[in-house]
Curated annotation (Swiss-Prot):
Tagged with keyword Protein biosynthesis: no
Listed PANTHER family: CARBOXY-S-ADENOSYL-L-METHIONINE SYNTHASE, TRANS-ACONITATE 2-METHYLTRANSFERASE-RELATED
Protein name, UniProt field: Carboxy-S-adenosyl-L-methionine synthase
Subunit structure: Homodimer.
BP terms from Gene Ontology: tRNA wobble uridine modification
Source organism: Escherichia coli O7:K1 (strain IAI39 / ExPEC)
Keywords: S-adenosyl-L-methionine, Transferase
Gene: cmoA
E.C. designation(s): 2.1.3.-
Length: 247
């Protein structure tokens, strides 16, 4: 059962850096719905993309799966035999709850839920890979290598879904969308103290890129096509496609 996020409603003397610990895992569904505009749409559309891209006898990877929302959306939309979903997260608290969520919904497609580092996972025989608000928590210097590995592990015609919080090269636009996002959180019941404390904890851990930077990395990895398919304020999602005739 998810609880309402009140983690930062009182002043915290020493904030430290953000971690996906048991306290965060307990309130995560409420937190992300109230903090990430368009999150529910992205999750449901990931399922629609899965219906289009997942092929028989292949694997789907959910890298940084948290509580398994994207995994469940994908699994609901797989209608082929001999497919498997591999869901990975490095947070023990998230993985424990993810396993409970996956087990609560029965479906023919098996799911391997793995506690581990996505940088160490081999990507093989993949028709679809999901990075849903995950890449932004890696060191920027490590992001290209992960995208390279994903491209190599995708089958021809496969797709990567990359959802992120964005920064903007146009400072005026960036300021507007930053403020709109804060308005969104206020409208969802977060106080100025909650917004400020969470931002302070995240600022050294979540380092955002522009859409242009993401597209450049995807192109360097080998993806022939990539495009922003969803955006709400400074959050959005790209889809990158490996050509059907790729070697």
């Amino acid at each position: 059962m998810s609880h309402r996020d009140t983690l930062f409603s009182a002043p915290i003397a020493r904030l430290g850096d953000w971690t996906f610990d048991e306290r965060v895992a307990e309130v995560f569904p409420d937190m992300i719905q109230r903090s990430v505009p368009g999150y529910s749409n992205i999750i449901s559309m990931i399922g629609m993309l899965a219906e289009r891209f997942v092929q028989p006898g292949t694997q789907v990877y959910d890298l940084g799966c948290s509580l398994g929302a994207a995994t469940l959306s994908v699994r609901r939309n797989i209608h082929h035999d001999n497919c498997k979903i591999i869901a990975i997260d490095n947070s023990p608290a998230m993985i424990e709850r993810c396993r409970h969520h996956i087990d609560a919904y029965k479906a023919p497609t098996p799911v391997d839920v793995i506690e581990g580092d996505i940088r160490d996972i081999a990507i093989e025989n993949a028709s679809m890979v999901v990075l849903n608000f995950t890449l932004q928590f890696l060191e920027p210097s490590e992001r290209q290598a992960l995208l390279d590995k994903i491209y190599q592990g995708l089958n021809p015609g496969g797709a990567l879904v990359l959802s992120e919080k964005f920064s903007f090269e146009d400072a005026k636009v960036g300021e507007l969308l930053f403020n709109m996002h804060h308005d969104f959180k206020r409208a969802n019941g977060y106080s100025e103290l909650e917004i400020s404390q969470k931002r302070s904890m995240l600022e050294n851990v979540m380092l955002t890129d522009s859409v242009e930077t993401h597209k450049a990395r995807l192109h360097q990895a080998g993806f022939e096509h990539s495009e922003l398919w969803f955006q709400c304020f400074n959050f959005g999602s790209l889809v990158a496609l490996k050509a059907e005739d790729a070697a």
